[in-house]
């Protein structure tokens, strides 16, 4: 698999070098992604957070968006296509979203409350003519709170949740708005829309070639004039293999690469390239299966695995481009709380716990883990997982890997540990977006969000944890909600619910010609301020 991806990466780099449309031009920025293919262009992207970064929040908008203007503070949600939202004081399941007037899709049609309803239908209503299984697979699990919705007037939408849920605005931030009129124009075919998409975002997608490139140009009529792009063109190219990305940057075939290989950072700096990093809400974990027969059902085994990891050694492997995990959340996070289990490197304590669980030199724990060779937020999964594998072997846990492409891993994650696609694996290396209560905590472990209802891949179920999740959803006071979130994180750590290894620093390498980029503490980024010398 890794060899095939390398061949595809080198082919993409060759196509990039020979393509006349990608020739250097004034104001053209070319970015090498870690994804192995161009993300879906129809609104709800695939390829994880990277898909949303490059083909979601560029060409599309949501009702609620993230403030990406600052590198110095964590992002917060801000008005997008909705100017305001509020929960009904008498009925905490009823939300009203007031929409921004005068917004148009790229095809010139109006954005209205009917557009919002139409887009929710494309994800949630299998009987709707515009229902798209591919987009639904990406978006449905993002909005599990939604029970119903309606247009109240052209600029007002009402959304009703299944139960009171204070996390709804964070869920809605994932839902991109595609043009209903464009879908009609394209013969009611999402395949046709993919080639000629229409959103309301600051960028317009003008070219799309699978596994080769996507091109975007500014939307001069964008509703937020401060975010009208300054570039002439933005081009994204899939280059999943780190050495191919680095080679493309050094040769001038791209101007910017995501996630440079750590062992190239010093030489890239000495060659005049910029290395940009920042903390962001990310973790690099193994999500552990809790189905019957999984060795991870024993807390002693989970704690032993966490104590086996030499996180400082991994930091050295990555040339310092990581933050060693002290929990599921990064150190200093406002929801960190005071967990009592410390994620230190203590192989002897790990061996003792494994012995208590019935394992030893004559009876090693043997298991299989799903991993990918690349992918959004996955950092450098092959050498990192091999490092973890070695650490675990030293205490008596023998791990074999099933290597699958990133998008395939996402599909396995959505299918769940009980599905045949998991191939008997008891865990998967999966990185998580942890910048809000729902995507950071609830979706991973709530009982009723096990597949196919949601993305609780491991089928974990604990009524005590569910009670805490319910408290978060029903608590609309931020200070009170924070106390509950701290308790949740303490439980995540003290019960070692994941193998918690590291947090990324979101490294990017770019040409000195790239100016004006502000790296937000977020999975998503604003490219509108960027210029090229």
Features from the language model and the residues they span:
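Detector for C-terminal structural segments
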Residues: 27, 33-35, 48, 54-55, ...
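N-terminal lobe/hinge region of extracytoplasmic solute-binding protein
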Residues: 33-90, 198
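A bilobed periplasmic-binding-protein/Venus flytrap-type ligand-binding module shared by bacterial periplasmic
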Residues: 66-67, 217-221, 280-304, 504
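Gly/Pro-rich hinge or "lid" segments in bacterial periplasmic/extracellular proteins
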Residues: 67-72, 173-229, 235, 241, ...
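Aromatic- and charge-enriched surface segment that lines or borders ligand/interaction sites
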Residues: 84-129, 158, 295-297
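Surface-exposed binding/hinge segments that line
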Residues: 98, 135-183, 207
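Ligand-site clamp/hinge motif
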Residues: 188-191, 221-267, 398
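Structural transition elements
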Residues: 203, 292, 324-357, 374-384
